[in-house]
Amino acid sequence: MPGLLGKKIGMTSVFSADGKNVPCTVIEAGPCVVTQVKTVEKDGYAAVQLGFQDKKEKHTTKPLMGHFKKAGVTPKRHLAEFKEFENELNLGDTVTVELFDGADYVDVVGTSKGKGFQGVVKRHGFGGVGQSTHGQHNRARKPGSIGACSYPAKVFKGMRMGGQMGGDRVTVQNLQVLKVIAEHNLLLIKGSVPGCKGSIVLIEK
């Protein structure tokens, strides 16, 4: 899927043609630079590696510095691969948000907000154990039983329990493109996308 790297700016709302107030996410999409072109003959598959956001040379490792010099571009902070670009791209070419002109829907990949260690009520939507009366006083938000006793004498894998919540790679599909503002490299997408303000996202057609 062809696409771009972008940065989530935040959320706002716009009015639709019929006067409805539509919540939307503002994403700074690109400009991205081609840092590597992969071919079926050499790499086994065809893809384009894009770089987003400049960074200083002193903060770049020597292997990556050689990679960028080979492409003839300045060091980039974020890299990602995309497939199936319609136009043939060469090293150093720039891909802008105009890629999404005419696109009705996109998929957005991001990293969800980290919530730390959370219990089963917040993490999995459990309802808690029973009533708050009839002698119960210390198990309102507990998971309850996690298995039988002597058989199977173990807790099955995949049992939903408390633990680290968030910080996962999340893909949201078929989000409507409301507007492309090419002069400011902005993309307005209906609804919310994963991640906090300033987080890096992948936008795919």
From Swiss-Prot:
Task: Name any one Pfam family assigned in the record.
Answer: Ribosomal_L3
Instruction: Provide the GO MF annotations for this entry.
Output: rRNA binding; structural constituent of ribosome
Signal sequence range: none
Q: Which GO terms describe its biological process?
A: translation
This protein's source sits in the domain of life called Bacteria
Q: Which PROSITE patterns match?
A: RIBOSOMAL_L3
InterPro entries for this protein: Ribosomal_uL3, Ribosomal_uL3_bac/org-type, Ribosomal_uL3_CS, Transl_B-barrel_sf
Name the UniProt key words of this record, in alphabetical order.
Ribonucleoprotein, Ribosomal protein, RNA-binding, rRNA-binding
A GO cellular-component term linked to this record: cytosolic large ribosomal subunit
Cite the SUPFAM superfamilies for this sequence.
Translation proteins
| Task performed by this protein | One of the primary rRNA binding proteins, it binds directly near the 3'-end of the 23S rRNA, where it nucleates assembly of the 50S subunit.
What HAMAP family does the annotation carry?
A: Ribosomal_uL3_B
- Which proteins does it associate with, and in what oligomeric form? Part of the 50S ribosomal subunit. Forms a cluster with proteins L14 and L19.
- Give the matching PANTHER family: 50S RIBOSOMAL PROTEIN L3, LARGE RIBOSOMAL SUBUNIT PROTEIN UL3C
Give the family from UniProt: Belongs to the universal ribosomal protein uL3 family.
Protein name as annotated: Large ribosomal subunit protein uL3
